[in-house]
Amino acid sequence: MPTVNQLIRKPRITPIKRNKVPALQSNPQKRGVCTRVYTTTPKKPNSALRKVAKVRLTNGFEVIGYIPGEGHNLQEHSVVMIRGGRVKDLPGVRYHIIRGLLDTQGVKNRKQRRSKYGAKRPK
């Protein structure tokens, strides 16, 4: 434990809080246009073809968003809504594309966690 004298000489520094989703600019979601839709491979222990899209947001930022769920209808010039939330095994992917909103369709034949994938209640 430091003495009072030591604290006067070198005060305690509070850690800097860095923003994990700077492109949202303190908004819950942001709209954007897909500039490129493609697949990437995840980091070392995992193996897959993850669907991602490069999105130009309304505030001018260009970000990479993950497309969750099985199958999607996105292509270049699709208008999408983006939310925060990174994908742990994809470096540089800090955002998620919201399913069932604007040009993004919901996931077909989804029975559980439907609200997360924009799927309507089955009859």
Curated annotation (Swiss-Prot):
Keyword list, A-Z: Antibiotic resistance, Methylation, Ribonucleoprotein, Ribosomal protein, RNA-binding, rRNA-binding, tRNA-binding
Modified residues (3-methylthioaspartic acid): D89
Miscellaneous remark of the record: The streptomycin sensitive allele is dominant to the resistant allele in B.henselae.
UniProt-recorded Gene Ontology molecular function terms: rRNA binding; structural constituent of ribosome; tRNA binding
Protein source organism: Bartonella henselae (strain ATCC 49882 / DSM 28221 / CCUG 30454 / Houston 1) (Rochalimaea henselae)
Entries under PROSITE patterns matching the protein: RIBOSOMAL_S12 (PS00055)
Top-level taxonomy: Bacteria, Pseudomonadati, Pseudomonadota, Alphaproteobacteria, Hyphomicrobiales
Superkingdom of source: Bacteria
Subunit structure: Part of the 30S ribosomal subunit. Contacts proteins S8 and S17. May interact with IF1 in the 30S initiation complex.
Disulfide linkage: none
Gene that encodes the chain: rpsL
Any GO BP: translation
Function recorded in the entry: With S4 and S5 plays an important role in translational accuracy.
Short name of one Pfam family: Ribosom_S12_S23
Name the record gives this protein: Small ribosomal subunit protein uS12
